[in-house]
Amino acid sequence: MEKTIAAISTAPAPGGIGIVRISGGEAFAVAEKVFRGVSGKKLSQMKGYTAQRGGAYTPAGEKLDDVVALVYRGPKSYTGEDVVELSCHGGLYMTKRLLQLVLDAGAAPAGPGEFTRRAFLNGKMDLAQAEAVMGLISASGEQARKAALAGSTGVLSRKIESIKQGLLEQAAHLAAWADFPEEDVPQVEEAALLEGIRQGEKALEELLQGFDRGRMYREGLVTVIAGRPNAGKSTLMNLLSGCQRSIVTQYAGTTRDVVEETVMVAGVPLRLADTAGIRDTDDPVESIGVQAARQRLETAQLVLAVFDSSQALEKEDWELMDALEKVPAIAIVNKSDLPTRMDVEAIQKRFEKTVSLSAATGEGLAALEQALSEILDTKDFHPQEGVLFTQRQRMDAQTALDSLREGEQALVLGLTLDAVTVCVEDALHALAALTGEQVSEEIVDRVFEEFCVGK
């Protein structure tokens, strides 16, 4: 029998309540050593999905706190085991004391993600669903939440299962033909086999194409705000972040360090970096900031290139445009509240999207959000349809796709059907690894060590 485990499942911060979760064959026995209900009914006598008010007591009979106990009976629980959740007042000290009482009563400390790991091992979810649970916990926006929720309810798993079923039909026919050549087994129709393989390829290609976009919503985009000094970069940073994150003055060269903030724009988390104004300078401190700005441009996933429309284009503006030729970027013609002296058409010719904006007043912010939505192609992302969440899933899907492409090539070149069979079976193994049907304990350990304790 697995040991009974316990952990604090609420955040390590003061709050309205704190929850200690207990799971395992001895969950009721352990909890009953700590909890006394006002009704006098023991937890082991309660039905699943019921609650009782009471208190938590030390072995000496001293009351620690008022507590509500929630009972879940296996297998109809999150972990598939008997589960008790004890809710107390949410002070850090109080919750830790309650956990210690539970551990002293016989429970073992839970490791990272151990509750969800048990749910996986007990067949309550597959590995892809478990990783989606982690996605729900870490979701920083609406699209990421929707994708994670869909994954946790099995949408991705059902997609993978559909691909597998199509390939299993092909593999079964190939195996029957190879194993019983003298029996009355229909000949393999190579045209139908080729079509089945290509259908699997298409489905996997669609999943892989959605991975980068899904990651964009989960992890955000490294976004650099760049431009020459006093173009309004820091004012834009403050506008987007909703507070004064960067110092703004009338003097050029005020920003010297890289100032960072994550903001939500057009539904996408932008990991903003406000950099020093790019120019030649004799100031040794400012030159370090300028060098850091140039380095950030090389690794940026998106650049907001800010130009001061109240001034004519200068050498630094042209150099910035040259540096961004191969980088996804939006030109922001700033200071639209002032008379325009800049050749805006010259900028428009160099960028896919150009937005006129006043970072000082906020006018044009909606246009910037629209431009971001278009350049990032957010309208065609449908998170409820199921997306790949992790690099592990992406690698397994890519392995399956590569195997199918090899099988298609073998078929087209006229190689033996045995060679095609090996490729189809390799694809099936990769898909089984993706959902956790065939996966090593090392991989399982690696997945769940990313979780927090208590989940």
Regions found by a protein language model. Name each.
Residues R21, M237, D274:
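Short, acidic/hydrophobic/Gly-rich beta-strand patch recurrent on exposed beta strands
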Residues E286-S310:
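Inter-motif core of Ras-like GTPase G domains
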